[in-house]
Amino acid sequence: MDKNIKEIIKNMDLKFRNIDGKKLLLAISTDKQKNVLMTAFMSEESLEKSIETGYMHYYSTSRDKIWKKGEESKNVQKIIDVYRDCDGDALLFTVEQTGWACHEGYMSCFHNKIDLNTGDSTVIGTKLD
């Protein structure tokens, strides 16, 4: 790994949290209009790959591995900007989304609106696949 990328990450002053025995932080991706597309975890290695390639890489706790967003679907996320939260344990990425972000075929993973009076959910948005 390029030493420069490790320096960049060090300068970001991040606080990776112990989640399922792994050092992870929360990554949120939005489009240019600031619509939330998805959230996932990142490890330091997936963050390195994201910086190195310019495309989002996440850490899957269920598969216990790093994955490039769109490696199977081709619905990749090209990084435009990144913001660190005040605690340093979450990153907000502005991305250029190719295709849809959700593996269920919706633009956003947040397509289930919950009624707080009943707990019932309603699918909003259009399935794109």
Swiss-Prot record:
It comes from the Archaea. The keyword Transmembrane helix does not apply. Zn(2+) binds at C86, C102, C109. Its cofactor is Mg(2+); Zn(2+). One of its GO terms (cellular component) is cytoplasm. Keywords: Amino-acid biosynthesis, Cytoplasm, Histidine biosynthesis, Hydrolase, Magnesium, Metal-binding, Zinc. Binds 1 Mg(2+) ion per subunit. Pathway: Amino-acid biosynthesis; L-histidine biosynthesis; L-histidine from 5-phospho-alpha-D-ribose 1-diphosphate: step 3/9. Coiled coil: none annotated. SUPFAM superfamilies: HisI-like. GO terms for molecular function: metal ion binding; phosphoribosyl-AMP cyclohydrolase activity. Mg(2+) binds at D85, D87, D89. Its EC number is 3.5.4.19. NCBIfam families: PRK00051.1. Belongs to the PRA-CH family. Catalyzes the hydrolysis of the adenine ring of phosphoribosyl-AMP. This is Phosphoribosyl-AMP cyclohydrolase. It comes from Methanococcus maripaludis (strain DSM 14266 / JCM 13030 / NBRC 101832 / S2 / LL).
